[in-house]
Amino acid sequence: TTFSSSNYITDSGASGTALATGQKTANGHISVTPEGDTLTTILELAEKNGLSTGLVSTSSILHATPASFIAHNKDRHDYASLARDFLKTDVDVFIGGGYDQFGNREDGLDLISRLKDKGYQVERDMKKIQSVTDGKLAGFTADGHNPKFSEGRGDMLPNATETALNVLGNNSKGFFLMVESSQIDWGGHDNSTDYIVSEMLDFNRAVEKAMQYA
């Protein structure tokens, strides 16, 4: 079923939580129960079992779907707290938008320095992101959300997918990778067939990278 615990029509927080944890929750929640108790995600289980883990998204990496795999919050829009949750995990690779919540925060916290202290290679240029072949990678492709494919995003999604696969593939135990083409959904919100189709075709290129890797 696709309904959330609070509404016949789900949202990305509740549906992302269902994908990440197998549990229903209320709209707007990020991997917590309707009452606010923490739910364990598949990414966290993978980490616990020695697998490498990664996230790729054409939105901000803090948007509801990717955040549901790594963060826990009753408010999907509490981006400042969601960013801090990234420092509480050992996720190996994440590539997407959202730099401002790590490096230009209103509370003055410098999460970029903290990421570097944890051993992450932090890059903001796609070519530099693609040059990373091992270790931990935090790739920021936009200050907030990435632009639409039709407005110049280019090959960010397939290239980010390929990079994540190559880095995570160094672990002989295996890995978990979540790749989201976020803006297919946004095209639906806009009731724009052109937007949906261009994003779907771009996502198909990312799927091709995954199939080639497999």
Task: State the predicted function of each range.
Residues 42-45, 85, 165-171, 211-214:
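Surface-exposed acidic, glycine-flexible loop patches that form ligand/cofactor-binding
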Residues 89-91, 129, 133-148, 152:
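Formylglycine-dependent
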Residues 1-105, 109-129, 135, 202:
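N-terminal catalytic scaffold of extracellular/periplasmic and nuclease hydrolases
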Residues 125, 129-140, 160-182:
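Active-site regions of oxyanion-processing enzymes, predominantly non-cytosolic
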Residues 75, 153-161, 199-203:
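Phosphate/oxyanion-binding active-site loops and adjacent basic polyanion-contact surfaces
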Residues 40, 80, 157-162, 204, ...:
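Short, well-ordered alpha-helical scaffold segments within catalytic/effector domains
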Residues 64-69, 144-152, 170-174, 178-211:
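Active-site His/acidic residue clusters
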